[in-house]
């Protein structure tokens, strides 16, 4: 029988992202190891589906282009390192507001690297920005929610699971396209 840490190391060889599945919260460190993080908050996530079509540019090609040509890529990498330290503190402190602010800021900075690449491109669409605005609007009304995005147009909503039902109800009134609840 292998320990979770040993299984993580084996999984890492097959897929960089698969090893995160062994922990509720995990961080990939610079030395290649994966660290389990602790937080007393119970997070939920839903996806506001903007577009289900295949991306025009793959994540791998996009990242290579950003690394090679984006004038803001190095600044984003430094920001990500700083955000990593801040995020670990916020998780330890169970500070959902800080977690959400870091999440949004870093996602926007990452997407900003695409517009300074040559040739420039964007995964985000007008509807992506509309989805982000919905999250901001609900937050201004007292809902505890923040957005994030990976390399694509869809917007993920981070929230506390205890708020899921009322948040889903409110988002459904504003977002008329598909919503996916990500269950644990």
Language-model features, listed with the residues they occupy:
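C-terminal nucleotide
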Residues: 38-184
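Gly/Ser-rich oxyanion-binding loop with an adjacent helix/lid
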Residues: 1-42
């Amino acid at each position: 029988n292998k320990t979770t840490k040993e299984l993580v190391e084996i999984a890492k060889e097959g897929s960089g992202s698969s090893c995160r599945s062994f922990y509720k919260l995990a961080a990939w460190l610079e030395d290649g190891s994966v660290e389990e993080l602790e937080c007393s908050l119970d997070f939920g996530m839903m996806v506001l589906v903007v577009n289900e079509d295949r991306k025009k540019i793959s994540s791998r090609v996009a990242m290579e282009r950003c690394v090679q040509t984006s004038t803001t890529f190095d600044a984003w990498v430094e920001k990500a390192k700083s955000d990593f330290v801040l995020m670990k503190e916020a998780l330890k402190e169970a500070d959902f507001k800080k977690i959400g602010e870091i999440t949004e800021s870093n996602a926007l900075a990452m997407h900003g690297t695409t517009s300074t690449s040559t040739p420039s491109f964007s995964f985000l669409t007008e509807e992506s920005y509309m989805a982000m605005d919905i999250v901001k609007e609900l937050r201004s009304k007292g809902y505890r929610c923040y957005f994030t995005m990976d390399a694509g147009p869809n917007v993920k909503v981070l929230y506390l699971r205890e708020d899921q039902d009322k948040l889903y109800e409110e988002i459904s009134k504003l977002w008329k396209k598909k919503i996916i609840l990500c269950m644990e």
